[in-house]
Amino acid sequence: MIDVKHLSKSFGEVEVLKDINETIDKGEKVVIVGPSGSGKSTFLRCLNLMEKPTSGDIFFEGENITQANEHEMNKLRQRMGMVFQHFNLFPHLTIKKNITLAPVKLGLMTADEADKKAEELLERVGLPDKADEYPSRLSGGQKQRIAIARSLAMNPEVMLFDEPTSALDLSLIHI
């Protein structure tokens, strides 16, 4: 599903990733562990092309995506969900609207279908009563679960999580 070959990423003189090779098969769960600043987030951002690798290639389902144009990158990101370390929820939208916005705007679902999906996902992450709240009214752990629900609403083929449990209560990590 994902094949990384000789991936390197530098920011100026600082080489953050050096000659990374990894194959991730469909259904496989991979955990990247390392100290703060070791390049874990940069690696994830390279996988979904939010960061352009300095060198190397990334293949997604056999297709080299490294040189994708803007349109191709946007299509790829629809297939590859990402939950960010800092959640990136829209503060001026309700929780339900945060979850339904992208699937409706991209034409993947009708508004009614997206609402139903949002309700199912809110139930799944244990926050069915938060649909009409705004992000500022939620705890860090609740925001993180909403970010997970929002990403799942796109029905991605692959999920990338950047520090997925950093704000979660230990009793909720099984979700």
Model regions and ranges:
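ABC family nucleotide-binding domain
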Residues: 1-173
